[in-house]
A protein has these predicted regions:
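Long recognition/docking surfaces used for binding and targeting
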Residues: 1-12
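SAM-dependent methyltransferase catalytic region
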Residues: 14, 18-187
Length: 187
């Protein structure tokens, strides 16, 4: 599973604390994903009670404009500037998909896969210093996507969204991190 791959990577990497590499526990990833979505929706006019995001499910359906939330989720952009093995990125996709499936109870497997593919290829971005960590993050997102594939179909170019770089201190901390021109145009 994508989670197992991340755990394995986190356990095998040596010297991570010397490099400032720390990995986020699953319960923190879940909380951060829900909070991020709640704040994003709130900034776009959808005010939800404190715990509503976490409690929207089949037994507690959302009674507002589900289509408006789905459209916002389709257009969200999330970046993890120190993504490591991609725990937050995968957690965010999982939370978006949990909400999508709850708000679209009649969605068929093709629609679910198409929405997830869109999220992975258009909404999720990450940067990390370690090439191996970036490769694991990409693989985790691909595995997450493949796990719901109904027909063999081309996978998105996640390698354009998850890149090796230093987005925190970079060569010049006064400048914003810029995606390479060839990758930026592909997005």
């Amino acid at each position: 599973t994508p989670e197992m791959l991340g755990t394995l990577f986190e356990e095998l990497i040596t010297g991570r604390h010397e490099q400032g590499a720390y990995y986020t526990p699953a319960y923190v990833v879940s909380y951060m994903s829900k909070e991020s979505i709640k704040r994003y929706l709130g900034a776009n006019g959808i005010l939800l009670s404190k715990d509503l995001i976490g409690t929207i499910d089949a037994s507690n359906p959302y009674t507002g404009d589900a289509q408006q939330i789905l459209e916002l989720l389709k257009n969200v952009k999330i970046i993890d500037p120190a993504c490591g093995s991609g725990a937050y990125l995968v957690g965010f996709v999982n939370e978006i998909m949990r909400l999508y499936c709850t708000l679209s109870p009649d969605a068929d497997s093709h629609s679910i896969f198409a929405f997830k593919k869109h999220c992975v290829s258009k909404c999720i971005f990450g940067v990390d210093l370690e090439e191996y960590a970036v490769q694991i993050a990409q693989l985790r997102l691909w595995l997450s996507l493949i796990s719901q594939a109904v027909d063999p179909m081309p996978l998105p170019h996640i390698d354009l969204n998850i890149v090796v770089g230093d987005s925190i201190s970079g060569p010049n901390p006064g400048k914003h991190y810029l995606w390479p021109a060839d990758q930026k145009s592909a997005l």
